[in-house]
Curated annotation (Swiss-Prot):
Single Gene Ontology BP annotation: response to hydroperoxide
Cited Pfam families: H2O2_YaaD
Annotated organism of origin: Lactiplantibacillus plantarum (strain ATCC BAA-793 / NCIMB 8826 / WCFS1) (Lactobacillus plantarum)
Entry-linked InterPro entries: YaaA (IPR005583)
Protein name: UPF0246 protein lp_0089
Family of this protein: Belongs to the UPF0246 family.
UniProt xrefs under PANTHER family: PEROXIDE STRESS RESISTANCE PROTEIN YAAA, PEROXIDE STRESS RESPONSE PROTEIN YAAA
Entry's Gene Ontology cellular component terms: cytosol
Length: 248
């Protein structure tokens, strides 16, 4: 069983909690992307990032001096968005840390796919960014099926806790009869079931923590996710879609 999650835009450098233990497997491709990004002018980079000057300028300055081999932070600690704060990996037990290194994978526009203890540096590049590289018109074409091949060398269930933007790098390449279970955290709004992005990110982080703490290796056991605000809805769920309803 493999679990996939999305990265976060907000990143930090943290070399104190845990050391980086492994190297990203597609570092050569990351170097290729870095070279392409460093050729962009400031206006081109700002357009690619869809952000204000306040965010674009420091990111552009950082881009010019990125070194992929120095000041590395384990990926699981480098991202500091809502999902990662609610996961709280810095307080995981050793068995929980071992679990995520074996089972959890972070999908990334810049690094492709990451194990939690792969050493990385801060970057800004979303998977849906319109960056052409060589013959590839965008990052989906650039990465192709490589993320899937690294995720599951042998067909096994995939637990999708990633956003659609990132899950699209895996779903088209599933082996015949291989299951990918989408985890849906939804709320009733005006009588309709909808997903609130912030609440979903919080719940995804909490679920990763739950899976790691309980060493979950059976897909059906995911339904027992213990959360004060969410309850598994068997009626609205299917074999490949587990729905959890917000209770407030």
């Amino acid at each position: 069983m493999k679990i996939i999650i999305a990265p976060a835009k907000k990143m930090i450098i943290d070399q104190d909690a845990f050391p980086a233990l492994t190297e990203p497997i597609y570092l050569d491709q990351t170097q290729q992307l870095l070279a392409q990004l460093q050729h962009l002018t400031y206006p081109e980079a700002k357009t690619l990032w869809h952000c204000s000057d306040k965010l674009a300028q420091p990111n552009y300055d950082w881009l010019q001096k990125i070194d992929l081999t120095r000041n590395l932070t384990p990926a699981i600690l480098s991202y500091s968005g809502i999902q990662y704060r609610y996961m709280a990996p810095d307080v995981f037990t050793q068995p929980a840390l071992d679990y995520i290194q074996a089972n959890l994978r972070i999908l990334s526009g810049f690094y492709g796919i990451l194990r939690p203890f792969d050493g990385i540096v801060p970057y800004r590049l979303e998977m849906q960014a319109r960056l052409a590289v060589g013959q590839a018109k965008n990052l989906y074409a650039f990465w192709g099926d490589r993320l899937y091949q690294a995720l599951t060398p042998r067909p096994e269930p995939i637990i999708n806790l990633a956003s659609q933007e990132y899950a699209k790098t895996i779903a088209p390449y599933l082996a015949p009869h291989q299951s990918m279970i989408d985890i849906v955290f939804a709320s009733f709004i005006d009588g309709k079931l909808k997903t609130k992005a912030t609440l979903a990110r919080m719940a995804r982080g909490a679920m990763v923590r739950f899976l790691a703490e309980h060493q979950i290796d059976d897909v059906t056991a995911i339904r027992t996710f213990d959360h004060p605000d969410y309850q598994f809805d068997e009626k609205r769920s299917t074999a490949n879609r587990f729905v959890f309803i917000y209770q407030h």
